Amino acid sequence: MDLSRIPAQPKAGLINVLIEIPAGSKNKYEFDKDMNCFALDRVLYSSVQYPYDYGFIPNTLADDGDPLDGMVIMDQPTFPGCVITARPIGMLEMIDGGDRDEKILCVPAKDPRYTYVKSINDLAGHRLDEIAEFFRSYKNLEKKVTEILGWKDVDAVLPLVEECVKNYK
């Protein structure tokens, strides 16, 4: 898979998210650049599972040295390697392993059920709480600590994506 062919921002206001982990999975897959395929990184130690499809924005480099993370709210899970053109609606800021780590929350651009969702404020607060709780607790049994800093709305996302695209280049 040639990731260089997948633009981070295919159109203004949209991003591409390459899915590594489908919703409902306890398996944490990661794209292995050396093998050029998806590989099982680990199985989550705790009883939680990924609430939505999770992956990364290709051709970006975040402060933690990895591509920028993205989570796409979907009604049905996709699969590792699926590229979803998505509309970012906000981001969860957290600390993971001592490093700042942002999780970009998105909705699929090609799903009419989410055309009204433009911001995290368009979602039920409980949904955001569930996502934050997942990231707060998913590493507990590994004796790793994550700290949730809070949610930022959509206006904070695109400048971060643009910065991470520049960092990659």
Swiss-Prot record:
Localisation? Cytoplasm
Task: Choose any GO biological process term that the UniProt entry carries and state it.
Answer: phosphate-containing compound metabolic process
Q: How is its activity regulated?
A: Inhibited by ATP, but not by fructose 1,6-bisphosphate or 2-phosphoglycerate.
A single cellular component GO annotation: cytoplasm
Sorted alphabetically, which keywords does the UniProt record give?
Cytoplasm, Formylation, Hydrolase, Magnesium, Metal-binding
Post-translational modification N-formylmethionine, affected residues: M1
Which residues make up the binding site for substrate?
K28, R42, Y54, Y138
Q: What is its EC number?
A: 3.6.1.1
Which residues of the sequence carry a binding annotation for Mg(2+) 2? D69
The residues listed in the UniProt record as binding Mg(2+) 1, with positions renumbered to this chain, are: D64, D69, D101
GO MF, one annotated term: magnesium ion binding
Q: Which cofactor does it need?
A: Mg(2+)
- Textual note on the cofactor: In the presence of Zn(2+) ions, activity is 13% of maximum, in the presence of Mn(2+), Cu(2+), Fe(2+) or Co(2+) ions, activity is very low. In the absence of metal ions, there is no activity.
Carries keyword Hydrolase?
yes
Q: Which reaction does it catalyse?
A: diphosphate + H2O = 2 phosphate + H(+)
Task: Give the family from UniProt.
Answer: Belongs to the PPase family.
Listed under subunit, the entry gives: Homohexamer.
For this entry, the protein name equals Inorganic pyrophosphatase
Protein species of origin: Synechocystis sp. (strain ATCC 27184 / PCC 6803 / Kazusa)
